[in-house]
Amino acid sequence: MFRIVKWLIALPVGIFIFFNAYVYGNIITYRAVAPHRTAFMSMRMKQFEQEGRDVALDYRWVPYNRISTNLKKALIASEDVRFAGHGGFDWDGIQNAIRRNRNSGEVKAGGSTISQQLAKNLFLNESRNYLRKGEEAAITAMMEAVTDKNRIFELYLNSIEWHYGVFGAEAASRYFYKKPAADLTKQQAAKLTALVPAPLYYADHPKSKRLRNKTNIVLRRMGSAELPESDTD
């Protein structure tokens, strides 16, 4: 009996260690190499297949300096205004999320920073529970420890979901505006950013009033967004 208990404890611990060793190795690789595709992309494409949707993956990696500063500022203004200065976690946002989750009785809000969102996109899935949030935090800490802010942001910009099968700034810019991501205007960048929290909902409701309102809010805020110090755009 004792041996069985030992195995029941050792097995999940071993899986946790193995998975995080795998993740860490990939984080080191991604400092210089673009991901072939992310875990979230694979999960989403499998979901579309199961739903009987004929969706092709449109994912086009471009370097950081070929993405409009307008889009960078819009995303920071909307998703993580403290991105340039924090170590991967926005503690005020996390405390607010905990309060909202406690009031609702389930994990709805995550207080996720850009770094945390990237951790989810690269390695995890859409599930909302405290175990997954803990793993997300561990990956975020590893990534922030060995990867500079510009590279984290570059990975994020290239992995965001924007429509059915459309991932990354370049694919989104060409899908919506028939132009490279480097040429996005402020209005276009704000509109793309407004899609980020719920891209598939807005794909089905493109004339949503909420989308228009969010676009206008992003436009007002993006001028004061602070990019990482090493940004040379």
Swiss-Prot record:
- So which domain of life are we looking at? Bacteria
What the entry lists under Pfam families is as follows: Transgly
Job of this protein: Peptidoglycan polymerase that catalyzes glycan chain elongation from lipid-linked precursors.
Q: Name one GO cellular component term.
A: peptidoglycan-based cell wall
Q: Where in the cell is it found?
A: Cell inner membrane
Q: Give TM segment ranges.
A: 8-28
GO BP, one example? regulation of cell shape
- Please give the catalytic activity noted in the UniProt record: [GlcNAc-(1->4)-Mur2Ac(oyl-L-Ala-gamma-D-Glu-L-Lys-D-Ala-D-Ala)](n)-di-trans,octa-cis-undecaprenyl diphosphate + beta-D-GlcNAc-(1->4)-Mur2Ac(oyl-L-Ala-gamma-D-Glu-L-Lys-D-Ala-D-Ala)-di-trans,octa-cis-undecaprenyl diphosphate = [GlcNAc-(1->4)-Mur2Ac(oyl-L-Ala-gamma-D-Glu-L-Lys-D-Ala-D-Ala)](n+1)-di-trans,octa-cis-undecaprenyl diphosphate + di-trans,octa-cis-undecaprenyl diphosphate + H(+)
Molecular functions (GO terms): pentosyltransferase activity; peptidoglycan glycosyltransferase activity
Keywords linked to the UniProt accession: Cell inner membrane, Cell membrane, Cell shape, Cell wall biogenesis/degradation, Glycosyltransferase, Membrane, Peptidoglycan synthesis, Transferase, Transmembrane, Transmembrane helix
Provide the species name. Answer: Neisseria gonorrhoeae (strain ATCC 700825 / FA 1090)
Which pathway is recorded for this entry? Answer: Cell wall biogenesis; peptidoglycan biosynthesis
InterPro entries in UniProt: Glyco_trans_51 (IPR001264), Lysozyme-like_dom_sf (IPR023346), PBP_transglycosylase (IPR036950), Pep_trsgly (IPR011812)
The similarity comment for this entry is: Belongs to the glycosyltransferase 51 family.
Its placement in the membrane is given as:
Single-pass membrane protein
The protein, known as: Biosynthetic peptidoglycan transglycosylase
For this UniProt entry, what is the primary localization, expressed as one broad class? membrane
E.C. designation(s): 2.4.99.28
